Amino acid sequence: MVQKSGMSRGPYPPSQEIPMEVFDPSPQGKYSKRKGRFKRSDGSTSSDTTSNSFVRQGSAESYTSRPSDSDVSLEEDREALRKEAERQALAQLEKAKTKPVAFAVRTNVGYNPSPGDEVPVQGVAITFEPKDFLHIKEKYNNDWWIGRLVKEGCEVGFIPSPVKLDSLRLLQEQTLRQNRLSSSKSGDNSSSSLGDVVTGTRRPTPPASAKQKQKSTEHVPPYDVVPSMRPIILVGPSLKGYEVTDMMQKALFDFLKHRFDGRISITRVTADISLAKRSVLNNPSKHIIIERSNTRSSLAEVQSEIERIFELARTLQLVALDADTINHPAQLSKTSLAPIIVYIKITSPKVLQRLIKSRGKSQSKHLNVQIAASEKLAQCPPEMFDIILDENQLEDACEHLAEYLEAYWKATHPPSSTPPNPLLNRTMATAALAASPAPVSNLQGPYLASGDQPLDRATGEHASVHEYPGELGQPPGLYPSNHPLGRAGTLRALSRQDTFDADTPGSRNSAYTEPGDSCVDMETDPSEGPGPGDPAGGGTPPARQGSWEDEEDYEEEMTDNRNRGRNKARYCAEGGGPVLGRNKNELEGWGQGVYTR
């Protein structure tokens, strides 16, 4: 009853729902009560302050969105400085085109420029791959050098210094590490790691050899200093010191001397330059081991020879080495010489046997040794050689070699570097003024130009740019005068008298000066009788035995070798010239004159 009367007194009928306004008649009443709770001493509320701060913040943002005059001028100044620095870099780049080569490097890493590399001039950085060769002209700053890729058609540009390459490598490793960490935080990786912990399993640790290998690859320097011109070294068909090998190599040296007259230095090297490994020269503890061993050359002699080869290459002439001790490309793979290995190849062992037997009993008794050496060379992969000469005729082999060397000459002498090399002029003048020397029996004797001083260390000792961490950005040749690499004026101009037109009778050096004494004039010894394809002999000295024209019986065995595709010269521009054909007569041209053209 009371409840009914109470309900009847209400302003709304019982059938209708009670609106919320009954509890809060004014819409602002609820908020006013809450505002009252957060009133400050000054009478303002937190909501008022918040709304005011929103207004102020919006007005500040709208104000700062419009750049001021000082900001615009600062940006313009920055752009002007960038353009001025780029203009100066382009001017220095243009001047460097005619400057001589300071030094050369072989790359151990590749580089492909990206916009974030901060190149002094965008679009002028040099792209290179591992095992490429670079000619460095000068240092631009600590991060960049000026040089060019040794390839036909390539001009000078900016090359990252070892410091720059190391910083790029560290940045790349940091990015990869962050990516691995982010990927390891995913659910799959976390659950798998939890499973490892629960089950007690443990990830296998890499073996010690793998760790050592990884450690060694981390410390490989980005560049190795090499001669400015790669020296040419002949190997094959068998061992040097035996008549067949010496005869065939002598014919090629004769050809090189005449074909590249004025552009090539041919010198004999008697020291065992295979000892000039970077690991040996840079490790004093290994010097004692080498000195105690029964090697034919001391380290001092080896260092002297390496030093001499580097100095000859500074003239940017072709350098050909008649190296007595080099019979396999692996002997020089760990040295700083980076030679052009020319392989004279006789594919058929029977042909080589016939040639060795034709030289007489003194050579036949060493037949097995020579055949074994030839087989070792034949087992090498083609990548170990720069040129493989397996032509049957000497003229074809000579043209094949000349084609490669002409391409290399163009790659190292771009048209932009037209001014003559002052080092070449100085060297040629020194050679012209030198008196006719006596036959050189010991090639290790020093022949210093006037005022020259011997180096304390061989050039091969600092074959790596990375070995001077305090001067990584400074290339050799630009070091202070007290630095071993900075003594350009103290290096020997012509330290061996047999380099230019040396004539030592009875030695292999006579191959460089007397083409008439070459194997191309050799005839058959009458005591042995002419071979199946030999011309009528007679009247020749006994030392000149046999000819390479007596091998027609084995023509069918060599036919499969005639279709070999020659390797394209790595220094040629894209779309090189046609490759010369092969003649069918087997080894006939090796017994004919090649200069009557």
From Swiss-Prot:
InterPro entries (alphabetical): CAB1-4_N_A-dom, GK/Ca_channel_bsu, P-loop_NTPase, SH3-like_dom_sf, SH3_domain, VDCC_L_b1su, VDCC_L_bsu
Residue positions where Phosphoserine is found in the record: S44, S47, S73, S186, S193, S547
GO terms classed as biological process: calcium ion transmembrane transport; calcium ion transport; positive regulation of muscle contraction; protein targeting to membrane
Tissue: Detected in the inner nuclear layer in the retina (at protein level). Detected in skeletal muscle, brain, heart and spleen.
Residue segments, region Disordered: 1-78, 179-223, 466-487, 499-597
Compositionally skewed regions (Gly residues) per UniProt: 530-540
Bias (Low complexity) ranges: 43-53, 182-193
Main location (coarse class): membrane
Biased composition range(s): Polar residues: 54-71
Domain SH3 per the UniProt entry, residue ranges: 100-169
Keywords assigned: Calcium, Calcium channel, Calcium transport, Cell membrane, Ion channel, Ion transport, Membrane, Phosphoprotein, SH3 domain, Transport, Voltage-gated channel
One GO MF term: high voltage-gated calcium channel activity
Cell location: Cell membrane, Sarcolemma; Cell membrane
Residue numbers of Phosphothreonine PTMs: T499
Biased composition (Acidic residues): 548-558
Membrane-topology annotation of the record: Peripheral membrane protein
CDD domains reported in the protein's UniProt record: SH3_CACNB1 (cd12041)
Gene Ontology CC: L-type voltage-gated calcium channel complex; plasma membrane; presynapse; sarcoplasmic reticulum; T-tubule; voltage-gated calcium channel complex
Function in brief: Regulatory subunit of L-type calcium channels. Regulates the activity of L-type calcium channels that contain CACNA1A as pore-forming subunit. Regulates the activity of L-type calcium channels that contain CACNA1C as pore-forming subunit and increases the presence of the channel complex at the cell membrane. Required for functional expression L-type calcium channels that contain CACNA1D as pore-forming subunit. Regulates the activity of L-type calcium channels that contain CACNA1B as pore-forming subunit.
Subunit-structure text: Regulatory subunit of L-type calcium channels that consist of a pore-forming alpha subunit and auxiliary beta, gamma and delta subunits. Interacts with CACNA1A, CACNA1B, CACNA1C and CACNA1S. Component of a calcium channel complex consisting of a pore-forming alpha subunit (CACNA1S) and the ancillary subunits CACNB1 or CACNB2, CACNG1 and CACNA2D1. Interacts with CACNA1S. Identified in a complex with CACNA1C. Identified in a complex with the L-type calcium channel subunits CACNA1C, CACNA2D1, CACNB1 and one of the gamma subunits (CACNG4, CACNG6, CACNG7, or CACNG8).
Family that this chain belongs to: Belongs to the calcium channel beta subunit family.
Protein name: Voltage-dependent L-type calcium channel subunit beta-1
Lineage, top ranks: Eukaryota, Metazoa, Chordata, Craniata, Vertebrata
